[in-house]
Curated annotation (Swiss-Prot):
One of its GO terms (biological process) is translation. Belongs to the eukaryotic ribosomal protein eS8 family. Part of the 30S ribosomal subunit. This is Small ribosomal subunit protein eS8. It holds the Pfam family Ribosomal_S8e. Gene3D superfamilies: 2.40.10.310. GO terms for cellular component: ribonucleoprotein complex; ribosome.
Length: 131
C-alpha cells in the first residue's frame, strides 16, 4: 500500500486546477499517514503497541470485548461486556460491520452506553451509560 494515498501535507494543486510552487522535490515521508485503525467487536481483547513520531509508543485496540462504563447515578465505573453495537452516527455502515468508534451506541451488560474515547488512538473503550 502506498503511503502517498494517506498524505497529510498541503495540496499541490490550486482550486483552479493549476499547480502550486513546490517547496521540495518529493513528498516528505514524515507527512505520510496510514489507514484508519478501527477496532472490531471480537471474542478477545487484542491490543497492538506501535512506535509513532518522536519515538513515542501508542496502544491501539484491534479487537475488543469489554468497555469501561461510567454510571452517572452511582458515580462509579464498571467493566462491562459489550454485547452489540446498536448505532454509529459517524457512519451507519460501521454498526453493521461491528466497528467501534467515538460516539457509537453500544449495548453492554449494564445497559446502553455511548463511547466517549477514541479506541484506535487511546487503546481503551470508555463509555457513559445512557439513562
Amino acid at each position: 500500500m502506498k503511503l502517498a494515498a494517506f498524505y497529510k501535507g498541503r495540496d499541490l494543486k490550486k482550486p483552479s486546477g493549476g499547480k502550486k510552487g513546490r517547496v521540495r522535490k518529493t513528498k516528505k515521508k514524515a507527512l505520510c499517514g496510514g489507514p484508519p485503525q478501527i477496532p472490531k467487536l471480537g471474542e478477545r481483547d487484542l491490543r497492538l503497541v506501535e512506535r509513532v513520531t518522536g519515538g513515542n509508543l501508542k496502544v491501539r485496540v484491534r479487537e475488543v470485548r469489554y468497555a469501561n462504563v461510567y454510571i452517572p447515578k452511582e458515580r462509579r465505573h464498571v467493566k462491562a461486556k459489550i454485547l452489540s453495537i446498536l448505532s454509529t452516527p459517524a457512519n451507519p455502515d460501521f454498526a453493521r460491520r461491528n466497528l467501534i468508534v467515538k460516539g457509537a451506541v453500544i449495548q453492554t451488560e449494564v445497559g446502553r452506553a455511548v463511547v466517549t474515547s477514541r479506541p484506535g488512538q487511546d487503546g481503551v473503550i470508555n463509555a457513559v451509560l445512557i439513562e
